[in-house]
């Protein structure tokens, strides 16, 4: 609750410069595991319009004067497009509550008033409270824009989800519109009553219609134990009854003494039965001056107003692909309700937004399909003759017909289950993040290592003894019998000095025995984007992941994990370095870690 209140105040303070509507979200075990929730480091978000462009405020002075060429923008790691894309991300504050709770009970225990139309118990093993922003330029909200949420962990890994503004806002905007209409009708009724009171106070001689008299007689009835004068003669004189009622209504609205109840004089709040309880501060220190006039009304703290108004609605929202479900809390006193925001929900813009989203997420499937096609192309080119590249003992009487059938089914299963967690994406992400300068530096270091050294020219290459160097690879393990695919497994690979075959171990140094299992196929991808499709026995199809012909800008937008996200204290939207305030979490964050 405190995180949502703080974020709401922060959004209100910068609304004039950065118009955003705050969305107060709650993430639970359906989104993150317990370990992921406790080790969460950053929460970022950005808005993308219906055309697929990032809708963000770029700081003054940081814009590029000259447009970049198509070749420069299409190069992997293009720095200018990388910087422009980076500025659209904004950091959100969050709080981790690492204990079981019931959401509505937790809100009530925090002092909030919960007034839901239909209450439902929401049990959580742990919760992450955060607030994201939706762009509303010129007080206009579009249901076709997309909100991108990115969670980042200290090791550099991250997860992305996309949400349509239509799913987030439609029900709340309709409910808020009904509330405003009800409030407007109530204000209009009060204004009409005030006009009627003024007419009666001015002594208007106009007679009220009979329907108005009947409604006034129902609303303002006579006292229970009082018989009005002329009640017995009202039947004889019909006009006297209406005249008497008009007079009583006029006297009631005018505030005559006989209609006012007096409870007696009130004592000062500092006295009980005439005894002084606390000495006035002015008597203690005559030079003390009050900040406000004694007759000014007391100002209610914003926290008290927030808690008193409480929560009006609790909504469940799915992402575009229906993978995760978040909960949105709508507070009554959120500042945006007084801004009179307009909401547009055009079907044409929604279709454009969905087309842009499909084109964006299609990049990963294009990569996966390209790897599959390359595997089939290598098999056709080599006529099915595969060399053994990984160390594994194979029996002489092994049935290769079963192996080829397994290869076909394993490829189909991998195509069906692979997504952004695949080893291809994990190997590609660092290359997109390093940039053109880092790629040139890496190539220069490689040339220096490959160049012959002077001592090698004189004495020949040295024979260095020791264990072979290990390399970090990523693997997708396809288990055909269980129809299970383990995506993005990090492994260590080294060549056997005796046979020259690859030996694969896990991060703890334990030997991986996938190749000796007859129902398992493995796809390995190196950081240089070389891949091995390995069949049982260590026989592999080797080739390279080609990026030619792919939309490089879409690749960067989809998969790059820029260093600015992981830099400590970096304001991504402004690009300036400042000390970082510690996040609020269930455990204290030591300042030494900042």
Swiss-Prot record:
Keywords, in A-Z order: Capsid protein, Host nucleus, Late protein, Viral genome packaging, Viral release from host cell, Virion
GO cellular component, one term: host cell nucleus
Localization per Swiss-Prot or TrEMBL: Virion; Host nucleus
Main location: virion
Pfam families named in the record: Herpes_UL17
Record-linked InterPro entries: UL17-like
Domain of life of the source: Viruses
SS bond partners: none
Ranges annotated as biased composition (Acidic residues): 61-76
Function: Capsid vertex-specific component that plays a role during viral DNA encapsidation, assuring correct genome cleavage and presumably stabilizing capsids that contain full-length viral genomes.
Subunit structure: Interacts (via C-terminus) with capsid vertex component 2/CVC2.
Name the UniProt record assigns to this protein: Capsid vertex component 1
Protein species of origin: Human cytomegalovirus (strain Merlin)
Gene name as annotated: CVC1
